[in-house]
């Protein structure tokens, strides 16, 4: 396993792999790795000869400085986990390597519409930061495929559109959400939960699942269904942030033609902002 911190060294190894005809997979992460990330690695290994995992806490996608400052950084433990998974290359650049002139004057990539709706509306600049760093990593690693978790559903859709619009010859693989036994979606931010909050946290998935059952049963008063779900979250101890029911293919509001629906939920529990989603196939 190679640990690479600089762009020139990464380019050198990528050139060698390309000359050898290797199929390269990229797994972009911000570190603090858990079983959900390992699922991405497993998927990448099944589909490629070489796996490159990046660990970079991207300052450009944080809308609050305090959130960036407290984001968990566990590089040594992350490298140990990736080594056990036999990842070929770990790319761990510093912010100075990625943004040598800082983020303010950085050329950026922005996906219109998807960057500013839903999650993007409440986190200005977040998705611009995501699309910019992912585009940079694509240019540096030159992967044949890249694996992303479906937990960040809007992010996945945004990256797919960026790849299509920019003409990247990269297969984007969405990997299903990995959940704890009680249903809580695995997330690096779950570490912000206290022991008591961790007991409450699966309630988000429970409320979302009940909402999905109503949709499958034919209920269509979305405004009332969302209001009830928000009330249920409040009663469980959450502070609801956003609940949306959207077309899973476009992320726009439902139409009569919508066949795949995604429920998108976010809620605060103490200092942790939890997000989750569920795909519903309508008959």
From Swiss-Prot:
Has keyword ATP-binding?
Answer: yes
Query: For binding beta-alanine, which residues are annotated in this chain's numbering?
Result: 61
Its annotated pathway reads: Cofactor biosynthesis; (R)-pantothenate biosynthesis; (R)-pantothenate from (R)-pantoate and beta-alanine: step 1/1
Q: What class of enzyme is it?
A: ligase
Q: An example Gene Ontology cellular component term from the record?
A: cytosol
Keywords attached to this entry: ATP-binding, Cytoplasm, Ligase, Nucleotide-binding, Pantothenate biosynthesis
Q: Which domain of life is it from?
A: Bacteria
What are the binding positions for (R)-pantoate in this chain? 61, 155
The record, for Gene3D superfamilies, names: HUPs, Pantoate-beta-alanine ligase, C-terminal domain
EC number(s)?
A: 6.3.2.1
Catalytic reactions on record: (R)-pantoate + beta-alanine + ATP = (R)-pantothenate + AMP + diphosphate + H(+)
| InterPro entries listed in its UniProt record | Pantoate_ligase, Pantoate_ligase_C, Rossmann-like_a/b/a_fold
Give a short account of what the protein does. Answer: Catalyzes the condensation of pantoate with beta-alanine in an ATP-dependent reaction via a pantoyl-adenylate intermediate.
This one is known as Pantothenate synthetase
Gene that encodes the chain: panC
């Amino acid at each position: 396993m190679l640990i690479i911190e600089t762009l020139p060294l990464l380019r050198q190894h990528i050139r060698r792999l390309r000359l050898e005809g290797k199929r390269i997979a990229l797994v972009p992460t911000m570190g603090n790795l858990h079983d959900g990330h390992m699922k991405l690695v497993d998927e990448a290994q099944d589909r490629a000869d070489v796996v490159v995992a990046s660990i970079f806490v991207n300052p450009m996608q944080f809308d609050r400085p305090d959130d960036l400052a407290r984001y968990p950084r566990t590089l040594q433990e992350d490298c140990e986990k990736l080594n056990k998974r036999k990842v070929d290359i770990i790319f761990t650049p510093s912010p100075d390597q990625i943004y040598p002139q800082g983020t303010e004057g950085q050329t950026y990539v922005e996906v219109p519409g998807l960057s500013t709706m839903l999650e993007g509306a409440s986190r200005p600049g977040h998705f611009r930061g995501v699309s910019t760093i992912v585009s940079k990593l694509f240019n540096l690693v030159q992967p044949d495929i890249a694996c992303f978790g479906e937990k960040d559903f809007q992010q996945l859709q945004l990256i797919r559109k960026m790849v299509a619009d920019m003409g990247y010859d990269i297969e984007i693989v969405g990997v299903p959400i990995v959940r704890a036994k009680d249903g809580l979606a695995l997330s690096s931010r779950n570490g912000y939960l206290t022991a008591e909050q961790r007991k409450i946290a699966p309630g988000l998935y429970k409320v979302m699942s009940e909402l999905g059952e109503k949709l499958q049963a034919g209920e269509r008063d979305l405004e009332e269904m969302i209001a009830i779900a928000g009330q249920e979250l409040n009663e469980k101890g959450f502070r609801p942030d956003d609940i949306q029911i959207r077309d899973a293919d476009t992320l726009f509001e439902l139409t009569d033609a919508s066949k795949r629906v995604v429920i998108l939920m976010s809620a605060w529990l103490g200092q942790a902002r939890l997000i989750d989603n569920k795909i519903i196939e309508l008959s």
